[in-house]
UniProtKB/Swiss-Prot annotation:
Residue interval(s) of motif 'HIGH' region: 45-55
Entry note: cofactor: Binds 1 zinc ion per subunit.
Family indicated by similarity: Belongs to the class-I aminoacyl-tRNA synthetase family.
HAMAP family hit by this protein: Cys_tRNA_synth
Name of the protein in its database record: Cysteine--tRNA ligase
Subunit text: Monomer.
Gene name tied to this protein: cysS
First-tier enzyme category under EC: ligase
Cofactor dependence: Zn(2+)
GO CC annotation terms, alphabetical: cytosol
PANTHER family according to UniProt: CYSTEINE--TRNA LIGASE, CYSTEINYL-TRNA SYNTHETASE
EC number: 6.1.1.16
Keywords: Aminoacyl-tRNA synthetase, ATP-binding, Cytoplasm, Ligase, Metal-binding, Nucleotide-binding, Protein biosynthesis, Zinc
Amino acid sequence: MTDRADADRPATSPTGLRLYDTMTGAVRDFVPLRDGHVSIYLCGATVQGLPHIGHVRSGVAFDVLRRWLTAKGLDVAFIRNVTDIDDKILNKAADAGRPWWEWAATYERAFSAAYDALGVLPPSAEPRATGHITQMVELIERLIDRGHAYTGDGDVYFNVATLPDYGKLSGHRIDDVHQGEGVATGKRDQRDFTLWKGAKPGEPSWPTPWGRGRPGWHTECVAMCEAYLGAEFDIHAGGMDLVFPHHENEIAQAEAAGDGFARFWLHNGWVTMGGEKMSKSLGNVLSIPAVLQRVRAAELRYYLGSAHYRSMLEFSETALQDAVKAYAGVEDFLHRVRTRVGTVVPGDWTPKFAAALDDDLSVPIALAEVHAARAVGNRALDSGDHETAMTQARSIRAMMGILGCDPLDERWESRDETSAALAAIDVLVRWALDSRADARNRKDWATADQIRDRLKEAGIEVTDTADGPQWSLLDGDSKDV
């Protein structure tokens, strides 16, 4: 999927890979900073609630990038952070009457379970924001010393006016910038953004030279990027909704601190429903457990990865079932070859498959090559040409392995994904229902009802019975608690 005419020329980089860089608006040759090594930072989850399929699309998309780079013989350092301190986390935990750290840890586990269910490789490191307060404070001190940040009413702000090219990633003109942070009395200019939030009653806080408080979101990622990958690294990735203000503000801090930061900026498109971004605030989310009640994890992974990573993925039941059928066709062919001919070990991917992935991870074209090989293999198998059938099957295994959904991989064959997903969600639902029971014992009916309602929003129905509460996925099987 290319956006510029010159992007059609063959790759000339040592890796053979060309990627669309949001900063330049063009597909560029990817040349790592260090020969043979690639450093990637992916903005991970803000662990405020159960993951939905929109949340995990970035994990699937950039898992393919990581697998492809690794297959090319490159050593990949892949960092995916966890935002475990945030306004939404604090507010939701307070509403539920739970400690904020317990709330964050619970949903961090839920995200980890979702990534694992979808076959996303674990990151090289998965730093939590709260584990890097020291690095954040040091970064803010550098910005203050360089004249790019100032204190006000216990907070610390970044002075946007000190960077004339602010907005270069998103295309925002500096005079038109609006941070969406609301009115803050300590700000000199409403275009400025928060680096550090002064302590408030009942909120967690850490000591700093300018008083107790907690970090701003944008500061967290800069500190963690540089702690693990250094002042300059290869790729910074995330959802397209992060381009502004989050990634724009990361760039501002890093450059103001004198660091090179990311050389490529990659952004994946949203999962949409009815043309709208899948979002809890819009009420149009599909939780991972709810979807895995209808399809297998490998099928959901195939679906999420079937569109080009930069395009919008409009969710529909028809499209999901089309993906299920397409995956089944590949799976059935491999099983037929294994039954009739023998063990199928991964072989070589085709040149067209490699060319597709080298062209900004054009997975739809790569999948077309998979299905072309399947068609050739099926004809060969039906005609008794077992050698050709096996060659095609081995190639398919190699290609589907890069895409993370090889049907003969032991992770997909060795377990019942639906049962595993239900077991994982059962742990989380039990925790929520224990909280609800505590609230009912305190006669805090409002909190008890709120927990039940939030579970329902996530696709989980709770029914009170004489034997205790039962939960079920909406339109699914029930489970005693």
